[in-house]
Amino acid sequence: MRVVAGAFKGRTLQAPRGQRTRPTADRVREAVFSMLGSVDGLRVLDLFAGSGALAIEALSRGAAEAVLVERDPRALAAIQRNLDATGAALVAY
């Protein structure tokens, strides 16, 4: 799994282990963002974030802020690793 476009293009993203999380495929994210158009300056909400790929893709494409909601500890660890790999800031509540 990788970031499709933007500032983090080509960066590899990790998915949480196990079968409780099913990451959105690269092609699906690419299609979603093609339909959405520009996300520059927008705020993004990623519910049931899993790997955080959707939010990270949005940040890569210029979104101003992303809020990720996830309760699975393994998924949270994957999100943290993915944010660290891209250099995106994390503020946790």
Predicted features by range, described:
Residues M1-Y93:
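Class I S-adenosyl-L-methionine-dependent methyltransferase catalytic core
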